[in-house]
Structure formats: C-alpha cells, structure tokens
Amino acid sequence: SHGLGGSRAGSAFLGKHWAARGYVAVFLQHPGSDESVWKDQPLAKRMAAMRSAASGKNYLLRAQDVPAVLDQLAKWNGESGHELAGRLDARTVGMSGHSFGGHTTQAVAGQRFPLGGQGLTDARVKAAIVMSPSAPERGDINAAFGNVKIPWLLMTGTHDTAAIGSQTPESRRRVFPALAPGDKFELVLDKAEHSAFTERPLPGDQQQRNPNHHRAILALSTAFWDAYLREDAAAKAWLTGDG
C-alpha cells in the first residue's frame, strides 16, 4: 500500500526482490490519495491538494480497497485460464505499506479504533510489515495496538518525518512498545529519512540516501515473510536472535 500521493510503481525494489524469492507481490493503488491528486495541479497548489487527500474518508476507502483486492485475487485464483489460476495460497497473505500505506496496513492488520472497534481488520492477512508507522493522535495507544494478534514488523528511521501530518520519529517509535507481545519486531535505521522506504528520494530530503538501508529492509522483510508465511524455522530463529 503506497503512501499519500504515490502509486503502485513506487516500491519496485521491494516487489522485485520478494517476487524473485517466490512471493506473489501485488501492489495496490488507492484512487483519491494516489499520484493523480497532485500530478495535474499547478506547483503552488500541490501541497494543498495532498493535504486535502489525507482525509478520514480516504483512510477508510484505502482500508476497504484491501478486502476488495483479496476478493478479486481469490476469484482469479479459481478462474480456469487466468494467468494466476491455482498459483495463489490464500492462507498465507502478508500486507505491507509505507506512510499512509503503513497506516492502511495497521488498520487492516489489527489496530483498534475508539469508535470503530476492529471493523477494518481482515483476518486473511496473517502478517504485516509497517514502514513509517503512525501512532494515534488521540486515545489510548495501548488500546489501539494491545490486541494485535498477528506478527508485525515495524520499520522507521531516526529522521523519519513527513511533509504532511504530525508524526515525528519519536511518535513512530511509540507503536512498537504498545503492541501485544509475541512475534513483533522493529527496525530503526540510523539517520534514515521518510524516503528510505521508497524507490527514490522525496522532495525535502536533507541528506544523501544510504544504500545499506535498502539492503537491510530487503533482508529483514524477506526473513519476516519466510518466518511467518512459509513457517521457515531458520528464518524465525534469525529474526529472534536464536539462529
């Protein structure tokens, strides 16, 4: 799930790597909060258009996109003659996202909300990778994350701020200790900015990207999928420090 103003092409480095290791990588694009929001706008109006798209309505629509895509994939998997027919294992679905896409992933993967309960969670998602996580701006953070039942891997950086929104590097790191214990992991990349998890630098970056960040993201994310989607004991032992 891409970030605000992004597209399904924004993290090809992840998709290519995971696909090369046997995973079917499906990239969502969320109408209403994707690149179409700003592309045709004059430069002076682009930030305002992006802020407008960072709405509660789009947040809900994004979360609703996920089950719709999973339903369609299941249909294609059982459709004779389709190129994906029989190639998908619906029992082993993982979800990942960055920034607004990370927020979307949180919603689908077990975050609770004061008014909405757990109504956005999709039980088909068995593991989640959240890049640039978001702490709730209101309410009890422990109530939000204390009942997450599936494995989560959080990734952020010590300079992980975004041009839109109130999240800080410190608020992003508040999510991990609030998660229910068991099969939860966090990677904090030193000096990594918000763009560390994207295909290319973002406007407003303050420093050169560290190529080792992508290497760490790829290695850890793949080990996480292997551990919890393939039940690979060696990968899980490596993640937990026992291997």
Predicted regions and their residues:
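Active-site rim elements
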Residues: 52-57, 139-141, 204-215
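Alpha/beta-hydrolase active-site loop
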Residues: 41-90, 107
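The feature captures the conserved acid-bearing segment of alpha/beta-hydrolase catalytic domains
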Residues: 117-191
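Gly/Ala-rich beta-loop-alpha elbow adjacent to hydrolase catalytic centers
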Residues: 97-101, 105
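Short substrate-entry loop that stabilizes the transition state in hydrolases
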Residues: 1-38, 137-138, 161-165
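Alpha/beta-hydrolase-fold serine-hydrolase catalytic core, especially in secreted/extracellular enzymes
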Residues: 190-243
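Residue in the alpha/beta-hydrolase core beta-strand immediately N-terminal to the catalytic nucleophile
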Residues: 92-94, 129
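Catalytic nucleophile serine of serine hydrolases
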Residues: 3, 99, 132
